[in-house]
Amino acid sequence: MTRIKICGITRMEDARAAALFGADALGFNFSPESPRCVTKDAARTMVCALPPFIEGVGVFVEQDPREIIEICRYCGLSVAQLHGSRYSEEETKLVLEGVRVLKVFRPETDFTPAAVLRFREATGVSAFLFDTYRPGMEGGTGEQMEGSLAERIFSGLPEGCYGVLAGGLNPGNVREAVQSLRPYALDTASGVEESPGIKSHEKMQAFVQAVRAAGER
């Protein structure tokens, strides 16, 4: 079954609704430049209110590994999602000392799954998120990845690697993405929002229903 992560949660009512509708994980953004940024205390309160077996994911952009571990431990987050060129193999290993890692790639047209294998062998990380590449942006483009590039990535992932698809996913297009790429998980933020950080409960429910319906075929 395809897992679902709803990212950019900023309000308790949205966290509870996402869990009720069937999301498997919720993302909390700690990048100060993001319109979806939350404080540590706010994230901790929301994570503590989640039902069992729903994971909290911390989203970080170019932040210090020690800060990441401290935030994840304080908030009760089980995964750190790492955006940015800072997170080399060595920097990623430092984060892994305290929390599991979801490594983000923003692949350009010449990207190949061999880069994923190299990173896994060097660090032990097995979960990778692929988001649409746009110069100067670390995610949140609201645009889908080019189809042939996405197909090349997800069809060529090494055994034991878990691919998460992000970028422009919404209730209207996610079913096709599931059926054509069969990703391990999907990540959506703006595709289920009324405005940045304010989720539409109707869109979240429709997104989850579309993913589940696609998986039944």
Swiss-Prot record:
Pathway annotation from the record: Amino-acid biosynthesis; L-tryptophan biosynthesis; L-tryptophan from chorismate: step 3/5
- Superkingdom of this entry's organism? Bacteria
Could you tell me what reaction this enzyme catalyses? N-(5-phospho-beta-D-ribosyl)anthranilate = 1-(2-carboxyphenylamino)-1-deoxy-D-ribulose 5-phosphate
* EC category: isomerase
Q: One Pfam family, short name please?
A: PRAI
Record keywords: Amino-acid biosynthesis, Aromatic amino acid biosynthesis, Isomerase, Tryptophan biosynthesis
Could you tell me the EC number(s) of this protein? 5.3.1.24
Q: What are the GO MF terms of this UniProt record?
A: phosphoribosylanthranilate isomerase activity
> Per the UniProt entry, what is one GO biological process?
L-tryptophan biosynthetic process
Q: Which PANTHER family match?
A: N-(5'-PHOSPHORIBOSYL)ANTHRANILATE ISOMERASE
Q: Which family does it belong to?
A: Belongs to the TrpF family.
The name this protein goes by in its record = N-(5'-phosphoribosyl)anthranilate isomerase
* Protein encoded by which gene: trpF
